[in-house]
Amino acid sequence: MEFLLQLENILKKRKQDLPDKSYTADLFRGGVDRILKKVGEEAGEVIIAAKNSDKKELTHEAADLLFHLQVLLVEQELSLQDVVEELRKRHS
């Protein structure tokens, strides 16, 4: 879980700096529509991997989905902590 918080900080820096030759910066430059397209693609790949009962592929695709979801959260100025707090509300 700690790494997800580190990744969030990396993503915020990429959004701020928009370095050349950065996949993440390219996503931010493409705006919310490009990011949403990637989230949708990765969600579909997670579904297929799960349907195929392929744990290795599911792990890979879930990582891709989590990454792109974090990019979306940063783009929308939300944090993982915001999501965790919502989950806590639902389960308390």
From Swiss-Prot:
Major location category of this protein:
cytoplasm
**Disulphide linkage map:** none
UniProt-listed Enzyme Commission number(s): 3.6.1.31
Q: Name one GO molecular function term.
A: ATP binding
Record localization: Cytoplasm
User: Per the UniProt entry, what are the Gene Ontology biological process annotations, in alphabetical order?
Assistant: L-histidine biosynthetic process
Instruction: Extract the Gene3D superfamilies matched here.
Output: MazG-like
Q: Which UniProt keywords apply?
A: Amino-acid biosynthesis, ATP-binding, Cytoplasm, Histidine biosynthesis, Hydrolase, Nucleotide-binding
Catalytic activity, reaction form: 1-(5-phospho-beta-D-ribosyl)-ATP + H2O = 1-(5-phospho-beta-D-ribosyl)-5'-AMP + diphosphate + H(+)
Single GO cellular component annotation? cytoplasm
SUPFAM superfamilies recorded:
all-alpha NTP pyrophosphatases
| Entry-linked Pfam families | PRA-PH
The pathway it acts in is: Amino-acid biosynthesis; L-histidine biosynthesis; L-histidine from 5-phospho-alpha-D-ribose 1-diphosphate: step 2/9
Give the main EC class: hydrolase
Protein family membership: Belongs to the PRA-PH family.
NCBIfam families assigned to the protein according to its UniProt record, in alphabetical order:
histidine_hisI, PRK00400.1-3
Q: What name has this protein been given in UniProt?
A: Phosphoribosyl-ATP pyrophosphatase
Species of origin reads Leptospira borgpetersenii serovar Hardjo-bovis (strain JB197)
Query: What lineage, starting at the top, does this entry show?
Result: Bacteria, Pseudomonadati, Spirochaetota, Spirochaetia, Leptospirales
